[in-house]
């Protein structure tokens, strides 16, 4: 079986080569920007390369061989990238571990990948690692990436500074040799996908995969060395990791946000031109804007909707290279001054493009952002495809789709309408799992995505649902839970939602409210309560949720509509295994943990 078509390209697009080239030509220009003690600090390309070489030499001093594994267990920070690329410079492999992973999840990855050195980002990750280190026989060293981490008297533990000092000029010849021997067929990473069932699988990606994506993104995107990109999604996920690689490949500035709660302030401070985000980010902004508009005087509401309408017409014409009538130009100038520019300021005022992935984006939300002049590029991809397979074109897209194919991506619709992918971006396979690797591909080498979908005549790709997640009610009706969850879950009062329907008489839902919004609402209605549990039992609160859910699900078929729901006082948790690090629901765990609440929704009076 032929797994994939390898890309024919030379070493010019090898990622490590691209970093070296940028460091040579952009010497004193800014490569990285990060926040320390409340101040943004810059690292020049020259200093960046020096730090990379220092760490590479230290890794060589610890006898790290070609294709050995180095793991990073940390939130985003500039040292994440430094560890990553220093590892790649010596032809070793980076294994990311989500900062939110439990000690047991980290232990599995460390042992399965035979990790030799682990870099930890903060005290919590260090403490978790100490819990399991004695169960990890291949682990030789735990390096604390911050000076604030308090180390125990443990032979494996060391500070960043002491580790760096172990490298010297004695390792320089070997570093030069490793750099000169780099191959596109080398693995650059093994990323463990946190499946909703079963143990994680290590996706093997090589430099040819990454080079393919660098090349196709060059053909598709307008990113220059003048751009500034703010990174706040985790580097342990292929979406932000591949994007960061592309930013460095283009010579743009990569900014780091370790505390995701500070994203709003970082947007106004950094004023980036580029930023990746997931649909939930846009949903929250959209809901907040609409909420503010609904509370505004009638005249302002009219002005807002008029401005959005004008923006929609203006950008539609511009996207299709059509002449913009004189009157519309004047209307747009006024709408932009009064409304649209102020909305763009919520994102810093300079955003020119925002890649979006990880889930489906509601069409109305995508259209809203495009109407105000924010170029959202919703994309589709997975770890196994080194991220992007398809994406929206600039201001020209079908809002219900996941875009058109990236250059050189080959996609067809297979059995059960499954989306099948082939091309240079597709993984080598799953680490130490030959059977699972074989099962992941068709006989002619297409990757099975597990997503059901279809194309329209214009080449737009649509996802209809996850094949394995279709639920069948006891009445024989098929339910697509993610579709219903995305419809209802966009409400400003809902933080998380899990649809229940498999083998049930009707659809029900477990809902975690957005307590910030809910408590503000309760305050407005003068609802008194001692704790959240009491608040969630309040009849006015229950009626409000029922009303809002019914309003949203009118467009759903009758058998798809939620008939009963239960409000939960605690969010679904990564620690408890209810959601994955990428925030996907682990339905089996949720069904078991909330069995009583679910049974109550079906054992009470008929819906």
From Swiss-Prot:
Gene Ontology molecular function terms on file: ATP binding; CoA-ligase activity; long-chain fatty acid-CoA ligase activity
Keywords assigned by UniProt, alphabetized: ATP-binding, Fatty acid metabolism, Ligase, Lipid metabolism, Nucleotide-binding
InterPro entries cross-referenced by the UniProt entry: AMP-binding_CS (IPR020845), AMP-dep_synth/lig_dom (IPR000873), ANL_N_sf (IPR042099)
Catalytic activity: a long-chain fatty acid + ATP + CoA = a long-chain fatty acyl-CoA + AMP + diphosphate
Keyword Ligase carried by entry: yes
Record EC number: 6.2.1.3
Family affiliation: Belongs to the ATP-dependent AMP-binding enzyme family.
PANTHER family the record matches: AMP-DEPENDENT SYNTHETASE_LIGASE DOMAIN-CONTAINING PROTEIN, LONG-CHAIN-FATTY-ACID--COA LIGASE
Protein name per the record: Putative long-chain-fatty-acid--CoA ligase
Naturally occurring in which organism (per UniProt): Haemophilus influenzae (strain ATCC 51907 / DSM 11121 / KW20 / Rd)
Lineage summary: Bacteria, Pseudomonadati, Pseudomonadota, Gammaproteobacteria, Pasteurellales
